[in-house]
Every structure is written in structure tokens, then in C-alpha cells.
Amino acid sequence: MLDIAMPKLECVAAAENYGRFKIEPLDPGYGHTLGNALRRVLLSSIPGAAVIKIKIDGIFHEFSPIQGVREDATEIVLNVKGIRLRSYAERPVKMILSKTGPGVVRASDIECPSNVEIVNPDHYIATLDSSDARLDMELTVERHRGYLPAENRDPVPIGEIPVDAIFTPVHKVNYVVEHTRIGGMTDFDRLLLEIWTDGTVKPGDALSYAAQVLVQYSSIIADFNRFDDEQEQVGDANGLVIPSEIYDMPIEDLDLSTRTYNCLKRADITKVGQVLEMDEKQLLAVRNLGQKSMDEIREKLIERNLLPTLPFNSAILNTNVAARLNDGSAE
């Protein structure tokens, strides 16, 4: 392998929500290669916490007015989206807000469990206009990545209001590539990277996490030679052999509903072969993918004659479907 100039990383400016970093020297072209890759990962793949739904006493939908409260439910939902959280919980947790008027309701009025912290306690939520006004609210917090619209989640019970969740703690990333000198050579790159966060994560920690994500993905390619280059078929741990042309088929070709498609994509399931390798229990374990979506996936596979091309002990085939295929009734 050719020698690569090993760069040094330096933090040239730091604040609670801002960091400016310098990486140099880089071989020509590597400034944009690293800068663009880090920027994309920083904006999309850093985990964070957000409110995913709320429940307000006496309110059944987001268009309802609340007696004694200046804002209606829709405005409160918009204000709740601005609460920035730091959560150490593996599962969704609940926070409680109970406030009587008159007065202003802020994020600091919310009671949090020990593993959740509000980093902007002065954030405005609502105003109670009278002494008999009361606002009782339950907020559900979850950790995830990126942005999750309310319409892409399972329907919630009556009385609960879903919230568009902005999980990513990184607000903005800029990078600039400049020329730098090594000895008499002036065509090396200097990468200047600026990161703005919401305060729930330090810019330096976000940069480190983004680099680890890139390393994990790159390691898959680096280990490519460990696999048999002559292998033309892909098999799972259960001995199921899937022809490569079927395995590599994108899930877009199944023409799934938007909801089912988004569930698979968020779980990094992008190929039909990945679906065929999973049994029903594994598929149902995919976040927000229920029995209805499971049945839809199975029907789409049968519709496109993808299941009959495989042994009838295929992971996704249950006993009833296998019987139908053997009888010819599933064609």
C-alpha cells in the first residue's frame, strides 16, 4: 500500500454548541472526500432524543382548544418539538407536566426521569391565562436518528397526539478545503470543519461518532477478500440459498406501501434477500413493522413469484403459505 500522509486534528474554536476543527495535511483531493463524508454522517446519523407523542388531559386531538390556555393543542405540539433532550434510556420513557395558572409554562416545569435531561429549560411551551386554568400533559421521549414524521409511525390511541420528532442533535455543518504546504509541495489539502449542535452533544463528540460510523462501514469493504469471490449465491445461517439476482433486488421493486417501505429502510433493509433471510419473528421485531405490514411483504413476494423460486422452508414462509404454494393456489 502506498504511503499516505497522516494528518493531525486540531480544535481551533470551541463553544457549547459550536466547534471548528482543522485537519491537515491531507493528500490532494482528500479534503473534499473526508469533508463531504463527515458532513453527511453528522447531519443524518448522530443519535439523539426527542418527544414523539404527547397526551393532554381532556384533549382528544390536536385541533382542540384548551380552557384557560392561550395556545391550542396544535401550537403546544409545535412548542414541544423545540424541547431539546439528552436521554440515556434504551426504551421510550415518559415525562410529566402539571401546571396551574396563571403563568407561563416552560420546559423547566416538566418532571423528568433520572435518565433524561432537558438542556433548554427556559423553552416556552404555553401560557395559562386564569387562576383556574390547568395544563396536565404526558410526554413520551425516545432515542433515534434523523427525522421521523408523525405519519410514518403506527397509529396512536385516541387522546394521544403524535409529534414530528427531530432526533438529530447536529443543526448545521460547513466545511472548507484550503491548500497547505509540506516542504516544497503546495498541493496538499487542509480541511476546516464547522459543526453546530443543539447543546445535547458536544461538537467534538459528534465528530468522533461520525468518524466511527465511517470506519464501521469502511471495515466491511476492507474485509471483502475474506469472502469467496467465486460464490454466486448467497446463503443464510439456516442453509437457505438465495440466487444472487434475487438477493440483490432492491425492496423498491416490491412496490410496498410507504409505511412498510419506510420501516424497512430505517432498519437498513434495502434488498429483497435481506427480507428473505429473516423469519417472521425477526421481521416483526423491526421497529414499527406490525402484522399487517408483515402480511403485505409476504403477499408482494408471492405476487412476484419470489417465494416459489426458493425452498419451501424459506424463513418468511409459514406453514399455510407453503401449503398454498404446493397446491398451486398461491400462483
From Swiss-Prot:
Keyword Nucleotidyltransferase: yes
Keyword Translocase set for record: no
Assigned EC number: 2.7.7.6
Keywords attached to this entry: DNA-directed RNA polymerase, Nucleotidyltransferase, Transcription, Transferase
Catalytic activity reported: RNA(n) + a ribonucleoside 5'-triphosphate = RNA(n+1) + diphosphate
Transmembrane segments: none
Chain residue ranges for the region called Alpha C-terminal domain (alpha-CTD): 243-331
Top-level lineage group: Bacteria
GO biological process: DNA-templated transcription
One term under GO cellular component: cytoplasm
Any one GO MF annotation of this record: protein dimerization activity
Pfam families on file: RNA_pol_A_bac (PF01000), RNA_pol_A_CTD (PF03118), RNA_pol_L (PF01193)
Residue numbers spanned by region Alpha N-terminal domain (alpha-NTD): 1-225
The family this protein is said to belong to: Belongs to the RNA polymerase alpha chain family.
Domain comment as written in the entry: The N-terminal domain is essential for RNAP assembly and basal transcription, whereas the C-terminal domain is involved in interaction with transcriptional regulators and with upstream promoter elements.
HAMAP family documented for this protein: RNApol_bact_RpoA
Subunit structure: Homodimer. The RNAP catalytic core consists of 2 alpha, 1 beta, 1 beta' and 1 omega subunit. When a sigma factor is associated with the core the holoenzyme is formed, which can initiate transcription.
Function: DNA-dependent RNA polymerase catalyzes the transcription of DNA into RNA using the four ribonucleoside triphosphates as substrates.
Protein name (database record): DNA-directed RNA polymerase subunit alpha
Gene: rpoA
